[in-house]
């Protein structure tokens, strides 16, 4: 009954502008992370860019949460809005954690599977950016939203595979040499895998919203 009633009330569309701004920031963060994973002397520069985009995303998240408290009619349930923007923010937060580890351990070279993961994370960010505008008309876009979330889940699985492959390669490379290099590399892999996990969380939140609205 409440869902039917809400459908006839004017909605605050500013949320979709905020979602778009946040998703664009996440894409920029993922691109900076990808550049960071190329390695070289410019690595700290790209780490700083990741940090800046994470700060920008935090500011937008606060705007969304403030709007949730102040807006009478929201596009969909307030809890769903909070969970969606929080899961998106968690993804770029984890990118920042990756960059922090790189700065802390002064890493300048990255393994090929790490760079492959970086490419997949950019794909994830772009998929989220494609999905969010479709939430303005969920009933018309169920098939596309489902396809996007399924692709996000597949990408998360591919990242898991690359994580395992990369750890095995690190072990074989460093088991008779520098243990610290293995530990540092394993930590970076762990952070990268968590970025993909957070994107999968975004997919789950989108699916939850779709189920609630159709």
For the regions a protein language model found, what residue spans apply to each?
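Cytosolic, long alpha-helical scaffolding segments
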Residues: 1-214
